[in-house]
């Protein structure tokens, strides 16, 4: 925990090495001080086909899934930092966005908890 899942247009992977992109999001999330390094997970899904801005414009959207308990201010801070970093890396990409969702402690289970 947390999980950051990047959805992007396929062309993004030609603009920047995917591993570098994942590392930038990872490092930005870690820099907030909210998460332990070994708990952060970042994944990427690229889409060959999408309809954005009425056409095939490039985009990046990050789905941030974090354990409940963070303040709205903390969630806004991490959102702003990740979008700022992505905007620095991809200044010509017209759509860069993020949303943060809370996991509920009561319903989250992984195999180490069994």
Residue ranges of predicted features:
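A domain-level signal for the structural core that forms small-molecule/cofactor-binding pockets
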Residues: 2-114
